[in-house]
Amino acid sequence: MRIADVLRNKGSAVATISPDTTVTELLAGMAQYNIGAMVVTGPDGLVGIVSERDVVRRLNERGADLLGQPVSEIMTSVVVTCAPGDAVDTLTGLMTENRVRHVPVIANGQLAGIVSIGDVVKTRMEELKAEQEQLQTYITQGG
């Protein structure tokens, strides 16, 4: 299975923010869309990603004053990305190796989607269910 298959199932919409968005505005957007990370974009495209984990760590370090600061202060600027043609298994390894749960998808230099570990698990569960149904059909039809 490829990343393109995951995006086909979940859609390619990506919630983005600009680097000067405040952490408070970031949190409001994450709550509104019920998501765990937002991609930070500038005029030239992807510049970073900010996750719930980034916010929690920085709040612990800097306190509530962080809420009025721009997300550029806390974003991860070296972003792990993948491509639509990449295998889901490869992405799973990448997520584990880099300890990230959200990976932007880049196609032809443009942001084409985002895949979370939850999306990967859901897709894999659907794949396993289809395999199970095929095996049950094979068994009941006498192989």
Model-inferred region functions:
Residues M30-Y33, M38-D54, M95, V103-G118:
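A glycine-centered beta-loop-beta connector
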Residues T21-Q32, G63-I74, G109:
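Short, charge-rich amphipathic segments
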Residues T16-N34, V40-T41, T81-R99, I106:
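The conserved cystathionine-beta-synthase
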Residues M1-S12, S51-V80, D86-T96, I117-G143:
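Tandem CBS (Bateman) regulatory domains
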Residues L7, L26-L27, L46, L91, ...:
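Generic leucine side-chain signal with a strong bias for well-ordered alpha-helical environments
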